[in-house]
Amino acid sequence: MEAKQRTRHRDGEERRLVAAADGGAEEYDPWTAWLYKPHTISVLLVGACLLIWASGALDPEGASYHSSATSIKRGVWAMIAVFLAYCTLQAPSTILIRPHPAVWRLVHGLAVVYLVALAFLLFQNRDDARQFMKHLYPDLGVELPERSYGADCRLYVPENPKNKFINIYETLFDEFVVAHILGWWGKAVMIRNQLLLWVLSIGFELMELTFRHMLPNFNECWWDSIILDILICNWFGIWAGMHTVRYFDGKTYEWVGLSRQPSIMGKVKRSLSQFTPAQWDKDQWYPFMGPLRFVQVLFLCVVFMTVELNTFFLKFCLWIPPRNPLVVYRLILWWLIAIPTIREYNSYLQNSKPVKKVGAFCWLSLAICIVELLICMKFGHGLFHDPMPTWLIIFWSSVGVALVVFLLAWSWRNHLKYQRKRL
């Protein structure tokens, strides 16, 4: 009986949260209800005042002088700020409501700005695009040496006077080690499926092997690729991420409003818990449910690996060093975009009703991935002189043919089963 009451309470709480996210601010706690009421006119007036102050619209003539280049930069940033403010207030809400629906509307606006910036970059030539990056970070626009991790694969280097295990030491303390662990933790929290995570982990190592003739950065030693990447960094990130998933999956989501917390400490904990999920969905991908679902899940994996490959090719083509903040900003933005994208795509797959279109974030993610790929292809002309090895062409051609035959056989088998049931 108590379990049924808890279930009804949780279901009612979820309905209340969804209704409030759709604009029912009166359903929220009295202390925080004002955060969910529309403040469009107030923000418009405050924004107008900020524009007056920043632009000097009411200043006397000649009171504030800026060069043409500075004025253009200020104008572009103001244009982006106005657009993001509009998106935060007016963009469509997503299925995510924590910490606030406006946060995900802002992420939606950032994704659109990034897509538009990529479209602009696509219409430049390679040299102009590299020099354009100086406007984002002054140190860019300079050709960089690309590090090769496979130049010396010895585990023990006896002639090195400082460290006999210098190769292992430099690999372990490379910035990509931390990036691998954090990246796979983030993927595990988003995807929540161990099988897909290992497919992505091994698949990306195959991508590095495939494109090592193009990017020196992908030329890794066998122990770096198999032991350090897959069995240590990726495994630890997936392990930590799946433990995080199980932690949130085991919690009971019965939220009590801030005003109903009996103590100051309770109010602080409730405020901090606003940055945790309102409820936890078990994403069931079922890749072997049928040929169509297999292709849909495989498509998700292909997009994931393409986005990761774009990171390295964009750095190479645009001369962006690995430690430049722009690399980190892009990865953070992609992570923020991917969170609602995965939720939308999984809801699209699990919806039993015939859904005609995917969510806005799914569309934006695919569009950004395509434009990034087009930039890599356009700016990569003439940079990669070594042809793909013949054995790689044969290998991937065989994989493609085997995949097509497998899907056709699977589809034919399902068709025969359906025909037998009809008889």
Curated annotation (Swiss-Prot):
Pathway info: Phospholipid metabolism; phosphatidylethanolamine biosynthesis; phosphatidylethanolamine from CDP-diacylglycerol: step 1/2
Q: Name one GO cellular component term.
A: endoplasmic reticulum membrane
Lipid bilayer topology: Multi-pass membrane protein
Q: Which GO terms describe its molecular function?
A: CDP-diacylglycerol-serine O-phosphatidyltransferase activity; L-serine-phosphatidylethanolamine phosphatidyltransferase activity
Top class in the EC scheme: transferase
Q: At the top level of its lineage, which domain of life is listed? A: Eukaryota
The Enzyme Commission number assigned here is 2.7.8.8
What are the GO BP annotations of this UniProt entry?
phosphatidylethanolamine biosynthetic process; phosphatidylserine biosynthetic process
Q: Mind listing the UniProt keywords for this protein, alphabetically? A: Endoplasmic reticulum, Lipid biosynthesis, Lipid metabolism, Membrane, Phospholipid biosynthesis, Phospholipid metabolism, Transferase, Transmembrane, Transmembrane helix
Pfam families per UniProt: PSS
Where, subcellularly, is it found? Endoplasmic reticulum membrane
Q: Give TM segment ranges.
A: 38-58, 77-97, 103-123, 195-215, 222-242, 294-314, 319-339, 359-379, 390-410
Q: Which reaction does it catalyse?
A: a CDP-1,2-diacyl-sn-glycerol + L-serine = a 1,2-diacyl-sn-glycero-3-phospho-L-serine + CMP + H(+)
Q: What does this protein do?
A: Catalyzes a base-exchange reaction in which the polar head group of phosphatidylethanolamine (PE) or phosphatidylcholine (PC) is replaced by L-serine.
Please state which protein family the record places this protein in.
Answer: Belongs to the CDP-alcohol phosphatidyltransferase class-I family.
Q: Which PANTHER family match?
A: CDP-DIACYLGLYCEROL--SERINE O-PHOSPHATIDYLTRANSFERASE 3, PHOSPHATIDYLINOSITOL SYNTHASE
The entry's protein name is CDP-diacylglycerol--serine O-phosphatidyltransferase 2
High-level lineage = Eukaryota, Viridiplantae, Streptophyta, Embryophyta, Tracheophyta
Q: Tell me what gene encodes this.
A: PSS2
